[in-house]
Amino acid sequence: MRLAIAIIGVVLLGGGAQASPETLRFVITRNSEQIGTHTIAINRSGKEISVSLSTNLTVKILFVTAYRLQHNETERWIDGKLLTLNSTSDDNGTRHTVSAAAKGTGLEVKVDGKATVVDANIMPASFWNPELLKRPVMLDTKDGQIMPVSVRDGGEEDVKVDARTVRARRYTIDSRYSQDVWFDDQGHLVQAKLVASDGSVIMYRPL
């Protein structure tokens, strides 16, 4: 069974430079059962931002591993522009390496050693950078595919987070798959949701 599971990373929307690193941890569930974790580490120094992301999940059905994903990624940004990106993925046995580097007015992307130059304004689909919500195309950092994207503002909703109810704005991001993310009025991620190819509900919630 192959599950289409997005790699979701989110930080605060906006905000100024921070001297200390940020580490964000999320638990990933499938139909309310924990299947993995997602971690984002962000270091800010003036106009430079370095980001490390890690996703590890395993889906078991009747004690048999049906799907496994391991993804590790680093990004380096200066003054809002992507300088370099490197990722490795093991998607249920299918391995990919993806890299990107600024080259002239474009972005050179290498997928499993094959290079192409794309528009420098394409955003990685790691979702930590809220600028992605404004762009029509993104780079899937798991396998290097260039994907058109559209974003719909679903308005504000009440979302239960542990024992609290949080007022949050919902965005639906449509691309190879559709997923929803919710942000509170401070720009914090409240939760994320997508429906996998087998109909199961995948949720990302902060630890």
Predicted region positions:
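Bacterial N-terminal signal peptides
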Residues: 4-14
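Acidic, serine/threonine-rich low-complexity disordered tracts
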Residues: 19-104, 109-113, 118-207
